[in-house]
């Protein structure tokens, strides 16, 4: 038994270089380190974990310095006390190991996609529309809100048979008077149809006049194809008591108080298009009324209760 224990201790002592350990540990700890190595079973196999992609290629053998995961050799170590029992100040900017050459920040054997990582679809829309229209990409990604209104599967009858496709109608807005409606189609999947509709909606952004930044100017009776819309302005705190499609459009446009009824056809697509057209074309602002009458109109509420 004594011979076996002696042989294992000799084998573990030969595994480490005492000169290397003495650089990082005092002599009082070297003996305990050597004794701790004897408790490791002989049949233990040290392998790299396969489940972790960004893992060092070793487990507990910290006597060797890895070229990527560790610091460069010769750097100061703070765990060993000096003769004066004072610790030196560790400056991270000076001791930090620089990145490997050629701008590669990943360990060997790991790669990323060609685009450098995953991008959101809204970022792709913003980048493309910035080149096409000059709209700020941050405005598209951060301030614009997108809501799908209609998503359905369409089947077209042709000479070759029935061809299925996907249709999407979405609305975008910044909740501050800007709103746009877009349509998209795709034969592959619904997500691509929504992507195209989002692209089209941002290009169709329009400004909606709002009274006190919360409701519409007066009442609107508007007809769009088979849809009849009756929209009424409301007092503060009234809320949105309208059709579910008109509700989503008002949320994106920043309209907070509105009452409305939909008569005749209840087609969601025509309701959405008719609502946008009613907001942009059927409203008459105070300036337009004053210009038509040839008189000066004053908003009494703003005159007496202006801030």
UniProtKB/Swiss-Prot annotation:
Biological process terms in GO annotation: mitochondrial translation; translation
Species the sequence originates in: Saccharomyces cerevisiae (strain ATCC 204508 / S288c) (Baker's yeast)
GO cellular component: mitochondrial inner membrane; mitochondrial small ribosomal subunit; mitochondrion
Protein name: Small ribosomal subunit protein uS5m
Compartments where found: Mitochondrion
PANTHER family with a match to the protein in the record: MITOCHONDRIAL RIBOSOMAL PROTEIN S5
Classification of source organism: Eukaryota, Fungi, Dikarya, Ascomycota, Saccharomycotina
Span of domain S5 DRBM: 144-208
Oligomeric and partner information: Component of the mitochondrial small ribosomal subunit (mt-SSU). Mature yeast 74S mitochondrial ribosomes consist of a small (37S) and a large (54S) subunit. The 37S small subunit contains a 15S ribosomal RNA (15S mt-rRNA) and 34 different proteins. The 54S large subunit contains a 21S rRNA (21S mt-rRNA) and 46 different proteins. uS3m, uS4m and uS5m form the narrow entry site of the mRNA channel.
Pfam families for the chain: Ribosomal_S5, Ribosomal_S5_C
Record InterPro entries: Ribosomal_Su5_D2-typ_SF, Ribosomal_uS5, Ribosomal_uS5_C, Ribosomal_uS5_N, Ribosomal_uS5_N_CS, Ribsml_uS5_D2-typ_fold_subgr
Further facts: Present with 6680 molecules/cell in log phase SD medium.
GO molecular function: RNA binding; structural constituent of ribosome
Family the UniProt entry places it in: Belongs to the universal ribosomal protein uS5 family.
Transit peptide location: 1-13
UniProtKB keywords: Mitochondrion, Ribonucleoprotein, Ribosomal protein, Transit peptide
Protein's job: Component of the mitochondrial ribosome (mitoribosome), a dedicated translation machinery responsible for the synthesis of mitochondrial genome-encoded proteins, including at least some of the essential transmembrane subunits of the mitochondrial respiratory chain. The mitoribosomes are attached to the mitochondrial inner membrane and translation products are cotranslationally integrated into the membrane.
Gene name of the record: MRPS5
